[in-house]
């Protein structure tokens, strides 16, 4: 994938930034692919940088992801909770599986979705192979992650743990309005005023 370059004029001449570096200057982090350890390390590094730069200003995490590794995603989640700024989460396109979990983990009142996005929750996927003892170990690990994710989803949404467990047994897709009613997000957003801060500031 070709990454766009942004050219800026300043008193010192022209400066070139890749689009993600330019967005980072506005405290915008973009999670736009499947979550794996490499992506998680990049997201964590950006969150830590923005925390060090200004611990008082919000960070905007835009999510368009089909999900991915639970352990990698939990690294992002733990960092979101570890740093001092509020992390505003915004779904644009798709937030599925770990993507939906991270969307729900944003600061309360600052979890959002654009109007035509889709949001999906389900249980962790597993493909255990090998000897019986190895399969048993992997199965226990999957059940551990399932319980942890369900507990956090119940905390994020306010839903009873029994409903979370039932709804995540299969792929459970929601529109933004349905996700708002469910408690995964706080608002569905569209336009923002010209010249304002990024759309994630709406409602603050």
Swiss-Prot record:
Entry's EC annotation: 3.4.21.92
Q: Which GO terms describe its molecular function?
A: ATP-dependent peptidase activity; ATPase binding; serine-type endopeptidase activity
- SUPFAM superfamilies according to UniProt: ClpP/crotonase (SSF52096)
| Keyword tags | Cytoplasm, Hydrolase, Protease, Serine protease
| Localization | Cytoplasm
Per its UniProt record, what Pfam families does this chain match? CLP_protease
Q: Which GO terms describe its cellular component?
A: cytoplasm; endopeptidase Clp complex
Class of enzymatic activity (EC top level): hydrolase
The answer to keyword Oxidoreductase applying to this record is: no
Q: By its UniProt entry, which NCBIfam families does this protein fall under?
A: clpP (TIGR00493), PRK00277.1 (NF001368), PRK12553.1 (NF009205)
Function of this protein?
Cleaves peptides in various proteins in a process that requires ATP hydrolysis. Has a chymotrypsin-like activity. Plays a major role in the degradation of misfolded proteins.
Name recorded for this polypeptide: ATP-dependent Clp protease proteolytic subunit 1
Q: What's the source species for this entry? A: Nostoc sp. (strain PCC 7120 / SAG 25.82 / UTEX 2576)
């Amino acid at each position: 994938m070709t990454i766009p370059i942004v050219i800026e004029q300043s008193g010192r001449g022209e400066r070139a930034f890749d689009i993600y570096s330019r967005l980072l200057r506005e405290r915008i982090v973009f999670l736009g692919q499947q979550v794996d350890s490499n992506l998680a390390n990049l997201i964590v590094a950006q969150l830590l940088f923005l925390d060090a730069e200004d611990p008082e200003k919000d960070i905007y995490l835009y999510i368009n992801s089909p999900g991915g590794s639970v352990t990698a995603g939990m690294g992002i989640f733990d960092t979101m909770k570890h740093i001092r700024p509020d992390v505003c989460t915004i779904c644009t396109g798709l937030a599925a599986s770990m993507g939906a979990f991270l969307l729900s983990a944003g600061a309360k009142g600052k979890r959002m979705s654009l109007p035509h996005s889709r949001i999906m929750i389900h249980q962790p996927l597993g493909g255990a192979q090998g000897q019986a003892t190895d399969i048993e170990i992997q199965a226990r690990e999957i059940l551990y992650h399932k319980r942890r994710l369900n507990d956090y989803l119940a905390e994020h949404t306010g839903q009873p743990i029994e409903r979370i467990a039932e709804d995540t047994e299969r792929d459970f897709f929601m529109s933004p309005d349905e996700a708002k009613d469910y408690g995964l997000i706080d608002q569905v957003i569209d336009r923002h005023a010209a010249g304002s801060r990024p759309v994630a500031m709406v409602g603050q």
